[in-house]
């Protein structure tokens, strides 16, 4: 089961946290659609900023949006002008006052989403898929990853028949719930069709919060 399911989804509430935090009741569907639309719009708008995650919280009658990015300067702009424009746009979309936070991703080589997007961009620039995968694996392990697994699927190298190619180095224990595994996907639109990229990065083990607190009490 651990091999098939989304590794972040299965660890929610154990060692991973939700990207959206709010309680809605009857407005659940409305809030969910707003979140999906906002994430898609921001991803398109901030493509050059290497956005990893967008966290959305909705305390009473306002919203807190946190953007995790490898290039915060691109979003903030000159004298913080970009961030204010973006905050107004998000506020108009959500219909409530918005507090916008920008957080820097210190090690983009260990962020599965950014690694997957990096490989996808290289494939669009006609870099050989094996070279792009090897480069990503090497830089992730140098940055301190315990293990990494990459899957690239589609008409690789313009082949007639689509196939999947895997590259794996180190440990990626998908069945171990305390294993901190980051997972990211991306699509590369090439002249031969779409190539899908999946990345799993194992960063080490985290003891679940309950276990840790009981151990410290003893």
Swiss-Prot record:
UniProt-listed Gene3D superfamilies: 3.30.300.20, Ribosomal protein S3, C-terminal domain (3.30.1140.32)
Entry keyword Ribonucleoprotein: yes
GO biological process, one term: translation
Alphabetized PROSITE patterns for the sequence: KH_TYPE_2, RIBOSOMAL_S3
GO cellular component term, pick one: cytosolic small ribosomal subunit
UniProt keyword annotations, A-Z: Ribonucleoprotein, Ribosomal protein, RNA-binding, rRNA-binding
InterPro entries on file: KH_dom (IPR004087), KH_dom-like_a/b (IPR015946), KH_dom_type_2 (IPR004044), KH_sf_prok-type (IPR009019), Ribosomal_S3_C_sf (IPR036419), Ribosomal_uS3_bac-typ (IPR005704), Ribosomal_uS3_C (IPR001351), Ribosomal_uS3_CS (IPR018280)
CDD domains noted in UniProt: KH-II_30S_S3 (cd02412)
GO molecular function, one term: rRNA binding
Superkingdom of this protein's organism: Bacteria
Start and end residues of each KH type-2 domain: 38-106
Subunit structure: Part of the 30S ribosomal subunit. Forms a tight complex with proteins S10 and S14.
Described function: Binds the lower part of the 30S subunit head. Binds mRNA in the 70S ribosome, positioning it for translation.
Family, similarity comment: Belongs to the universal ribosomal protein uS3 family.
Name of the featured protein: Small ribosomal subunit protein uS3
Organism: Legionella pneumophila subsp. pneumophila (strain Philadelphia 1 / ATCC 33152 / DSM 7513)
GN (gene name): rpsC
């Amino acid at each position: 089961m651990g091999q098939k399911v989304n590794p972040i989804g299965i660890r929610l509430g154990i060692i991973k946290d939700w990207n959206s935090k709010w309680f809605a009741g009857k407005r659940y569907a409305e809030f969910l659609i707003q979140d999906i639309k906002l994430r898609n719009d921001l991803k398109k708008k901030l493509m050059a900023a290497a956005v990893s995650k967008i966290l959305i919280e909705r305390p009473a009658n306002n919203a807190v949006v946190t953007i995790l990015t490898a290039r915060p300067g691109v979003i903030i702009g000159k004298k913080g002008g970009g961030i204010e424009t973006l905050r107004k746009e998000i506020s108009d979309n959500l219909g409530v006052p918005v507090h916008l936070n920008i957080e820097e991703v210190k090690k983009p080589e260990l962020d599965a989403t950014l690694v997957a997007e990096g490989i996808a961009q290289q494939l669009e620039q006609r870099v050989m898929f094996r070279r792009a995968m090897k480069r990503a694996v090497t830089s992730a392990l140098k940055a301190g990853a315990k293990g990494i697994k990459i899957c690239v699927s589609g008409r690789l190298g313009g082949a007639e028949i689509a196939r999947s190619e895997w590259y794996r180095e180190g440990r990626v224990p998908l069945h171990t719930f305390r294993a901190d595994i980051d997972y990211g996907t991306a699509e590369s639109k090439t002249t031969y069709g779409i190539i899908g990229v999946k990345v799993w990065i194992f960063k080490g083990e985290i003891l679940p919060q309950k276990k840790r607190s009981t151990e410290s009490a003893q």
